[in-house]
């Protein structure tokens, strides 16, 4: 783990030097683990459910705290889901959920660690996907195998590319919630001024040509972005590589593929075509966008609604597209799963599972996607009449879902 952390520090430094871009999450792999049901696990789930039913019959209410991250539409979605649950299933089963804002993913993770030591954790929390393994291996998360199997939750209904980070050593520790991929955002009004349209930027050569044209013809930046491993990994994946090797004990940035990726961005930065920021300055990218001083930036599909609001306010046309193709298309996934903490009572665990099921069911997956811009996590959600109608009205929202077909293994864990 120490060696891996050192590698990740090196990668972050390289990412900052290259101006390689950013995102809102991290890894994905193309494998789905199977869950083995044990008698002990089933008995555990039965006992917890019986406890919850007895408490409901006696009029007791189980109070749960649920921690979430981010403000804006994401915050509204979390608050609305908790309220809707409390008014329906919660009222029926004697469960009340209080949703509490905890800042960024990193801030939430730090608070969870401190709360676990003090035995004051919430019952549930969102968790950035690349962090799940670390928390699970340290015994902080509840193994969900028994809950999933006893409840008959169809894990196969979740999009396959979103599942790997839910598993640790073939056991389930989280359910896909607000999930994302990095995508390309464009101010198409600026691109048009330079003779380009976002729909024509399909390859790295196109990206370089469009960004150069913007800089030369308008004096604005072709691309603005802050550095982060997530998008750097997407660029490496598109070159048939990754930022770490398969065993995560060596960086691949010093390979021909790594040098090509870093060299591409370094040249554009040196020419003043790309406005690069370090990984702590992501707000400055938003400032460039709001000042109409950049044509292209890369970010999470979860930022779609915020970017649409900016475009509407400032009167420019927003475009979204796949990460431009190098040797091939490719992307990691990001965002968060919902997890259950391991140090709560059986009564609280039974109640927490009810909320986890509710917030990741098809109807709520549809609502969350439309509300926030994150991916619809379930196939039944993405294929629903409601989502299909939404995609017809808002085709920009379908880009990330279509890009899921190109998800590749991202060999790294959260450096935090």
Regions found by a protein language model. Give the residues of each.
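Short, well-ordered beta-strand elements
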Residues: 60-72, 95-100, 123-124, 173, ...
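Extracytoplasmic "Venus flytrap"/periplasmic binding protein-like
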Residues: 90-158, 189, 193-195, 202, ...
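Glycine-centered hinge/linker elements that transmit conformational signals in sensory
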Residues: 210-213, 249-278
């Amino acid at each position: 783990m120490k060696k891996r952390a050192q590698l990740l520090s090196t990668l972050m430094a390289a990412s900052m030097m290259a101006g390689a871009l950013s995102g809102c999450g991290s890894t994905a792999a193309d494998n789905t683990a199977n869950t083995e049901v044990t008698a002990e696990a089933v008995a555990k789930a039965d006992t917890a459910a019986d406890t919850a039913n007895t408490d409901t019959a006696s009029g007791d209410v189980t109070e749960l705290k649920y921690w979430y991250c981010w403000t804006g539409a994401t915050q509204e979605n979390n608050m609305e889901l908790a309220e809707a649950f409390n008014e329906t299933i919660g009222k029926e089963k004697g469960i009340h959920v209080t949703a509490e804002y905890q800042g960024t993913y990193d801030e939430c993770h730090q608070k969870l660690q401190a709360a676990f030591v003090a035995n004051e954790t919430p019952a549930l929390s969102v968790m950035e996907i690349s962090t799940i393994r670390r928390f699970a291996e340290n015994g902080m998360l509840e193994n969900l195998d028994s809950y999933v199997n006893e409840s008959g939750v169809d894990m196969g209904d979740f999009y396959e590319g979103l599942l790997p980070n839910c598993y640790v050593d073939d056991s389930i520790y989280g359910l896909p919630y607000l999930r994302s991929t990095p995508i390309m955002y464009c101010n198409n009004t600026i691109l048009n001024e330079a003779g380009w349209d976002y729909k024509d930027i399909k390859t790295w050569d196109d990206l370089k040509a469009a960004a150069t044209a913007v800089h030369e013809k308008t004096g604005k930046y072709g691309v603005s972005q802050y550095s982060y491993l997530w998008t750097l990994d997407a660029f490496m994946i598109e070159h048939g590589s990754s930022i770490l090797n398969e065993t995560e004990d060596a960086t691949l940035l010093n390979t021909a593929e790594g040098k090509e990726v870093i060299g591409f961005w370094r040249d554009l930065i040196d020419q003043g075509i790309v406005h690069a920021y370090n990984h702590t300055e992501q707000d400055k990218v938003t400032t460039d966008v709001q000042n109409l001083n950049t044509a292209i930036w890369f970010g999470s599909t979860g930022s779609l609604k915020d970017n649409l609001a900016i475009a509407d306010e400032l009167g420019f046309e927003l475009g979204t597209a796949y990460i431009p193709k190098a040797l091939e298309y490719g992307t990691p996934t990001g965002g968060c799963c919902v997890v259950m903490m391991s140090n709560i009572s059986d009564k609280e665990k039974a109640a927490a599972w009810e909320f986890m099921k509710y917030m990741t069911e098809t109807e709520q997956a549809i609502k969350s996607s439309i509300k926030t811009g994150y991916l619809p996590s379930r196939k039944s959600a993405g294929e629903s009449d409601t989502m299909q109608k939404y995609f017809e009205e808002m085709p920009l929202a379908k880009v990330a879902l279509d890009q899921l077909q190109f998800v590749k293994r991202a060999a790294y864990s959260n450096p935090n």
